[in-house]
């Protein structure tokens, strides 16, 4: 361990060894962020810090596990297991369980996942007899999530006129009522959702300064990974813990801030010096992942952003091939070309299938790629009909989201917390007990009337007046007896493995699947056996840790807080298809960015503000920097939307990449697209192949240098014939067409009046909308009608 500093480059070493105040480490793509975090902890341990005094917060269990394993190799398991290291949610769930009584919860509160929360929202909407299309459960839950992340309680929400007006404008005037009822039902059920874990930690620290002081003194230093992804609630918790000792080590990259739709706020990292005036900034600028061309191309794109911490990444890897850019007539042609390109490169360069990734903006775009990859009619490099290309959709049905696993987990939750209505509703009639939906609705109505959980109604003499026949009452009594017996059994053992086996056995889950011996049910039984094995492994791991807890409650906390990245365990040798958002933090030898068109990059919803455009540019930057060796960007003149071909323009970000680092490949004719319907050409063009410096290649057309990138887009669109995107009269406009005081009608924001016109390089207008308030619109992107 003595020579650990020798494994760091000078910039990494400076960041690790500095101990004179708060730090921000700007870690560019591929610059060794995890290594720096790991060695910072080692350095702290070497300089007198006790393991329990170090709080390290990550966004995924995978990241925390990787860091802990690296630390274990250097200092041993005994020290590594004493660190407070984990995701924001897992660490603060732990703190909340210790202090649950302060906030009106029991220590064994249930943690709802997105499925549970959505299910509860659906029940509330149905009970209120609201239009389920107008009040889409996922949209309602997202609204509530954003409010919690901004620390707005239901009461705060109801008295904020801006929110009420927004809800009325979106024809959802009952949002405040739904939020309040959701909040109350969670408390009755003794449950918290993911956002509550952060919300209630803030409440705990605000209302109980003695508890806050305890943790301020307990944690002598706080390390945070991916600081650019923090939301208001997370940022505030970190500040409360670190504001006295100012010992904070924040690592992140503002250029990779792409999660504002989840509540992440880039200003948390950009304005960290305001929180910590003595903050020292370190920059990790050497990219160990990508070739020089990919690194410099990405630099040339992201430097167009105005809101950023300046940095200049470099690479000492080989120069590599230029980024290839290719246009197609349709996304159908585009998808089949990508399939054949991947096939050709794999055959020529001996890559594995999992060395390739195809990235896109939205999940809906994967359909046409799946068709191209699945088709057995496409041609190989010799013009012969090829077999389908193996692929996987990243983020498919994860283990803990499979029905049989969720059924078992619902039983676990009910044993731990019988007031958990979502769990009870899921299993009260599974396996079938002749307890129908009408009975459940009657029980829920009584629960609502008496402010109880459904279990609370079941345990009351006379069921709070619910009228049921004798047969149904007998079935309910059997169910109550089963759960009560399992609850008593759980109180007698602290071993999750034993309880998981017993619950699965006593509930009848295995039996009902085994009775119908189909291949699907055999697989489901195997999944339940895997669940038992995972509980056994959990207990084994906990016993190896000093003070480790092996209870069912602790196992369920571990299960509940698995993140999206942690759930993806498919390591099959296949091409990965995924959104750019899902790709963050990953890397592949070869990356194709599919559908690089305006309205995808940037998305339609992001075009109305400079902040939105800059986040979309960061998204393209993230896509490019996933590539280690080769990157190709494709786009089509027409793409398919709802089964119809719609005209499309290239993403303006393509033109913003310095032409020195890109190579445009000429558009092939219709018959050259090795599609199932075309004749074999007998020749394959490897678009990833490195160019000879002496070869003359087509170059990207560059606008005059006096124009900024946004002006390029304005000029380009001003001379582009109207397409489907401007149908209905909504289109972009130039400064010459507008004046202050002019009324307009915007696609999203409705009616408004122009208050100010910025004639600087941004060509921005400020509009006061009747229902949406004041907005900044970029003329190169915003579509509206002049009234």
Residue ranges and their predicted role:
Residues 122-191, 209, 266:
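Basic/charged alpha-beta structural segments of nucleotide/phosphate-handling enzymes
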Residues 34-42, 67-68:
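Motif I (Walker A/P-loop) of helicase-class P-loop NTPases
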Residues 25, 29-37, 277-280, 286-384, ...:
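Helicase P-loop NTPase motor core
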Residues 53-58, 62-142, 152-156, 326, ...:
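Conserved P-loop NTPase-based nucleic-acid remodeling module centered on helicase motor cores
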Residues 44-56:
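Conserved SF1/SF2 helicase motif Ia
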Residues 168, 366-378, 387-388, 402, ...:
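Conserved helicase C-terminal RecA-like lobe
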Residues 595-776, 781-786:
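C-terminal accessory regions
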Residues 6-25, 36, 55-56, 63-66, ...:
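Conserved helicase NTPase motor core
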């Amino acid at each position: 361990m003595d020579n650990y500093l020798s494994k760091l480059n000078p910039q990494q070493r400076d960041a690790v060894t500095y101990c004179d105040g708060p730090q921000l480490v700007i870690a560019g793509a591929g610059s060794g962020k995890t290594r720096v975090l790991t060695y910072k902890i080692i350095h702290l341990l070497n300089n007198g810090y006790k393991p329990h005094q170090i709080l390290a917060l990550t966004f995924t269990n995978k990241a925390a596990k990787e860091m802990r394993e690296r630390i274990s190799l250097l200092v041993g398991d005994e020290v590594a297991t004493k660190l407070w290291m984990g995701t924001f949610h897992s660490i603060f769930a732990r703190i909340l369980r210790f202090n649950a009584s302060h906030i009106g919860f029991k220590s064994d509160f249930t943690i709802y996942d997105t499925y549970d929360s959505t299910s509860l929202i659906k029940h509330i909407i149905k009970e209120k007899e609201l239009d389920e299309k107008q009040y889409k459960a996922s949209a309602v839950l997202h609204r509530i999530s954003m409010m919690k992340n901004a620390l707005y309680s239901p009461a705060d929400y109801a008295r904020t006129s801006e929110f009420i007006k927004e809800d009325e404008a979106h024809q959802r005037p009952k949002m405040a009522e739904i939020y309040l009822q959701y909040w109350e039902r969670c408390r009755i059920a003794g449950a918290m959702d993911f956002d509550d874990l952060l919300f209630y930690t803030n409440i705990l620290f605000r209302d109980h300064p003695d508890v806050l002081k305890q943790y301020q003194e307990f944690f002598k230093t706080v390390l945070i990974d991916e600081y650019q992804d923090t939301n208001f609630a997370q940022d505030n918790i970190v500040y409360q813990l670190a504001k006295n000792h100012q010992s904070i080590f924040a690592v992140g990259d503002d250029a990779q801030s792409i999660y504002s739709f989840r509540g992440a706020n880039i200003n948390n990292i950009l304005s960290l010096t305001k929180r910590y005036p003595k903050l020292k900034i370190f920059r990790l600028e050497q990219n160990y992942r990508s070739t020089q061309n990919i690194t410099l191309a990405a630099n040339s794109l992201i430097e167009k952003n105005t809101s950023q911490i300046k940095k200049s990444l470099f690479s000492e890897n080989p120069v590599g091939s230029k980024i290839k850019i290719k246009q197609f007539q349709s996304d159908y042609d585009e998808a089949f070309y990508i399939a054949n390109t991947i096939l050709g490169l794999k055959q020529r360069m001996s890559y594995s299938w999992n060395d390739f990734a195809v990235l896109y903006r939205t999940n809906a775009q994967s359909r046409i790629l799946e068709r191209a990859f699945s088709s057995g009619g496409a041609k190989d490099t010799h013009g012969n009909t090829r077999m389908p290309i193996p692929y996987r959709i990243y983020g498919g049905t994860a283990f803990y989201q499979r029905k049989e696993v969720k059924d078992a987990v619902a039983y676990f939750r009910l044993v731990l917390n019988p007031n958990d209505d979502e769990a009870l509703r899921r299993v009260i009639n599974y396996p079938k007990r002749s307890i129908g939906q009408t009975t459940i609705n009657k029980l829920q109505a009584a629960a609502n009337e008496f402010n109880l959980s459904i279990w609370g109604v079941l345990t009351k003499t006379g069921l709070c007046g619910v009228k049921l026949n004798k047969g149904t009452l007998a079935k309910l009594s059997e169910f109550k007896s089963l759960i009560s017996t399992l609850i008593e059994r759980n109180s007698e053992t602290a071993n999750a493995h034993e309880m998981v086996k017993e619950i699965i056995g006593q509930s009848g889950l295995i039996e009902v699947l085994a009775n119908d011996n189909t291949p699907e049910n055999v697989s489901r039984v195997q999944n339940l056996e895997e669940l038992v094995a995972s509980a056994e492994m959990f207990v084994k791991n906990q016993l190896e840790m000093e003070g480790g807890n092996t209870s069912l409650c602790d196992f369920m906390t571990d299960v509940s807080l698995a993140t999206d990245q942690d759930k993806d365990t498919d390591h099959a040798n296949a091409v990965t298809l995924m959104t750019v958002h899902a790709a963050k933090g990953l890397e592949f030898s070869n990356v194709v960015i599919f559908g690089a068109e305006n309205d995808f990059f940037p998305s339609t919803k992001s075009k109305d503000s400079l902040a939105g455009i800059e986040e979309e540019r960061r998204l393209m930057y993230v896509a490019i920097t996933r590539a280690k060796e080769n990157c190709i960007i494709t786009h089509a003149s027409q793409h398919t939307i709802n089964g119809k071909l719609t005209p499309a323009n290239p993403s303006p970000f393509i033109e913003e990449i310095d032409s020195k680092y890109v190579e445009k490949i000429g558009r092939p004719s219709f018959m050259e697209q090795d599609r199932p319907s075309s004749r074999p050409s007998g020749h394959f063009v490897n678009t990833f192949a490195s160019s000879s410096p002496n070869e003359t290649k087509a170059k990207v057309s560059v606008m005059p240098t006096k124009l900024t990138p946004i002006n390029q887009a304005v000029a380009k669109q001003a001379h582009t014939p109207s397409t489907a995107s401007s149908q209905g009269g909504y289109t972009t406009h130039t400064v010459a067409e507008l004046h202050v005081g002019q009324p307009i009608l915007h696609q999203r924001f409705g009616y408004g009046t122009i208050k100010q016109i910025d004639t600087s390089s941004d060509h921005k207008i400020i509009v006061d909308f009747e229902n949406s308030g004041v907005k900044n619109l970029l003329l190169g992107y915003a579509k509206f009608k002049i009234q």
